């Protein structure tokens, strides 16, 4: 399984912040540290990775991405075996404007009741130290790679 995503960053007074997504739905409702993610989504066969990353950012954040030159951050492998390819883009969005696509699932389990939930229930800006705590552990390397790239430029 493969996903592609965009790590949006901004600089406020010389300090870098990154935008992360919290997954929606009842399974994730009470999880915080280690539960957040880069806005990303699954890649179908023969899809362009960067195009998928841009599409998924729009679907999960609800705001089209305008980024002329995304910075490649490489890939990371999650515990599940899923490979996540990521790019960084500089930009700014207001988390209050976030609108996500939705998914349906039976909830509560074995109830026969199907409910709809947002794929992402919120997005927030984080300083790198906080982002490392919030992110799925495998994705923390993406923040480190971004900071390395920004130091080099």
Each predicted region: which residue ranges?
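Functional cleft and adjacent loop/helix regions within the main domain
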Residues: 35-39, 45, 89, 151
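N-terminal strand-loop-strand
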Residues: 1-37, 87
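Non-DNA-binding regulatory cores of transcription-related proteins
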Residues: 115-121
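Short, charged/polar surface micro-motifs in flexible loops or helix N-caps
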Residues: 12-15, 25-28, 44-45, 80-82, ...
